[in-house]
């Protein structure tokens, strides 16, 4: 309790942004849980909030990730709204989806190439951090950033297993943000970790049956 009082007694812009990020994150999570296309709108707003926060705390890879989030949000919205190829594959054209992409499983044929791409991203981001920044946590920062990039792509493809990728990211980020003294964001990611399990189960129920 004393720690909470101390936290608010020295209220700063970074702490205010930390709280704003918490609220936006909860809204985003609810929309993702419901598989609502509007999650991509929040995905454009959140990077502005979190980008400042991560830069202020020296999480440079996470800061760079926010630029990717904005671009991925545009791509994700387009994929969910207008892609029809997998709707044809799953014979889900008769469902009331208004042309939106259906939820499907992560194809086994993509596991190996996506894994290799993820490892390559991790290595490149790690090298960038240790070469050009003063990051104190380059290994964890680069890992969560690389895996987040893969997970966000999987979300744009509307694969149910994207939740499992986020489960790993969120668990690691929770510990990382506690270490970096960003308590509200740490609490948000702890909640994300739990919701990733529930979200995965929810999305499995939404996969079209043939």
Listing of model-derived features with the role each one plays in the protein:
Residues 43-96:
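Hydrophobic/aromatic-rich structural module bridging two neighboring secondary-structure elements via a short loop
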Residues 1-35, 39, 83-92, 96-210:
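Polytopic alpha-helical membrane-helix bundles and their juxtamembrane interface segments
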């Amino acid at each position: 309790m004393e720690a909470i009082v101390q936290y608010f007694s020295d209220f700063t812009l970074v702490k205010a942004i930390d709280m704003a990020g918490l609220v936006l994150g909860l809204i985003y999570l609810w929309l993702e849980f419901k598989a609502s296309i509007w999650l991509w709108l929040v995905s454009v707003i959140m990077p502005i909030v979190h980008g400042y926060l991560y830069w202020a705390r020296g999480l440079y890879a996470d800061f760079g990730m926010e630029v990717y989030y904005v671009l991925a949000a545009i791509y994700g919205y387009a994929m969910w709204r207008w892609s029809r190829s997998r709707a044809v594959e799953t014979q889900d054209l008769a469902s009331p989806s208004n042309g939106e992409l259906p939820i499907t499983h992560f194809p086994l044929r993509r596991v190996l190439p996506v894994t290799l791409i993820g490892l390559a991203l991790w290595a490149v981001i790690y090298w960038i951090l240790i070469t050009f920044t003063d990051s104190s946590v380059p290994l964890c920062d680069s890992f969560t950033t690389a895996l987040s990039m893969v997970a966000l792509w999987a979300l744009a493809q509307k694969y149910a297993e994207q939740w499992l990728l986020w489960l790993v990211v969120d668990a690691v980020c929770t510990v990382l943000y506690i270490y970096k003294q960003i308590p509200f964001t740490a609490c948000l990611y702890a909640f994300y970790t739990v919701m990733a399990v529930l979200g995965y189960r929810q999305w499995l129920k939404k996969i079209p049956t043939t």
